[in-house]
Amino acid sequence: MTCDKHTAQTIGKGDLVVVVGAGRSGMAAARLLHRMGARVRLLERNADGVPADFVRWAAEAGVEIATGDHAPTQFEGARAVVPSPGMAVSKLRPLLAQGPDAPEIMAEMELAWRQLDGEPVLAVTGTSGKTTTVSLCAAMLRAQGLSVFLGGNIGTPLSEYVLSVAHGGADGQGRADVLVIEISSFQLQACTTFRPRVAMLLNISENHLDYHADMAEYIDAKFRLFRCMEEGDLAIFGQGVRDLVAARDLKPRTLFFDAAARRFPRTCLLGGHNQANIEAAWQACREFGVTPEAAEKAVADFAPMEHRLEAVAERNGVLWVNDSKCTTVEALRVALQAFDRPVVLMVGGKFKGGDLASLLPLLCGRVRAVVGFGASREHFEGAWMGQGDFPMSWHPALEPAVAEAAALARPGDAVVMAPATSSFDLFANYKERGHAFRRAVEALP
């Protein structure tokens, strides 16, 4: 399989491309494909899932929209298929033709990458810390005076950058000096020629096993980020993946960042893991000419990311912290290590797997109480109930859990919502869960 985007299969005028999913990246891909002259068919299971303004645009542009369950006939004759990040490639393949007539499966990221005109890419992946790290990278680069596009899994699809270049581009100044991209294992599974100049794998822990067949597939997806990199490129890794790196034959220069460097101590970011994110960002940005002075200023001015160990209030001497983005057992471990005060811990949601019992040594002596809400009660109580020196309780909804946490907390404590689960039992996404937590805290008497 070629890594040269110029010799990879091309999409010509009139070629049929099927886009699966009407999320932001799917709609951006459809618009870009239309601009390229392709014949576009967009599939969306939810009949109400396509925004009205996009439906109007599609009607004017001649882009077909089909709702309902996907069928093999919808993919017949397709030159390529662009799946939503949430659709596993393994579930898509049975719907497609095989052999010489098989369409290419490409992520929206891959589609957009092939349309770029030489802009250097700094890409970041990892189980946790991606969004904070790419945001730190963007801040450091901008502090150096560089124009930056920040996007990918963080929110703005790369296709939107490609479409925008003719209309002012990143930072309103045409083409960006650097494209800073957050990329997930979902997106990487369908990337074939994507080549960053600098790429970073922060860490790997058990995650998304409801999507990937097993841990090996998840790890392989993460390492696809480095597949097309060359000797002049730079691959940056956390110390925790050193053995995984040693088992692979990688072409680019490699660097393992020092998570304990504490190079830029002036920051309001909580936790040692954020010091690691800062060091990783610095090592990446040095490649683009960022000076220590510019990086130091960027770190000092950097505000905590929403829903990531975000201090939302301090009431009666109690610090309230929203870590709704904490969706895994490993992320909960990191969250707990960030506090040197007693914690009232709030957990619960749709459990994605992981060894909760392994957290018991960290919970004991550190956690005053555990207050759960929503789904997964059996997982948490099965692992922790009666095993430590902290009481546990459970509530069907978030609001009564916040009220009980307030009653249990003492001055000097932190109430930390670090659910260690996805949000899909009670909320549409982790952001909605975080906002609900903030509202519940603000409503306390």
Swiss-Prot record:
InterPro entries: FAD-bd (IPR002938), Mur-like_cat_sf (IPR036565), Mur_ligase_C (IPR004101), Mur_ligase_C_dom_sf (IPR036615), Mur_ligase_cen (IPR013221), MurD (IPR005762). This is UDP-N-acetylmuramoylalanine--D-glutamate ligase. Belongs to the MurCDEF family. The keyword Ligase applies. Keywords: ATP-binding, Cell cycle, Cell division, Cell shape, Cell wall biogenesis/degradation, Cytoplasm, Ligase, Nucleotide-binding, Peptidoglycan synthesis. Its EC number is 6.3.2.9. Cell wall formation. Catalyzes the addition of glutamate to the nucleotide precursor UDP-N-acetylmuramoyl-L-alanine (UMA). It is found in: Cytoplasm. GO terms for molecular function: ATP binding; FAD binding; UDP-N-acetylmuramoylalanine-D-glutamate ligase activity. Pathway: Cell wall biogenesis; peptidoglycan biosynthesis. It is an enzyme of class 6 (ligase). ATP binds at residues 126-132. It comes from the Bacteria. It catalyses: UDP-N-acetyl-alpha-D-muramoyl-L-alanine + D-glutamate + ATP = UDP-N-acetyl-alpha-D-muramoyl-L-alanyl-D-glutamate + ADP + phosphate + H(+). One of its GO terms (biological process) is regulation of cell shape. GO terms for cellular component: cytoplasm.
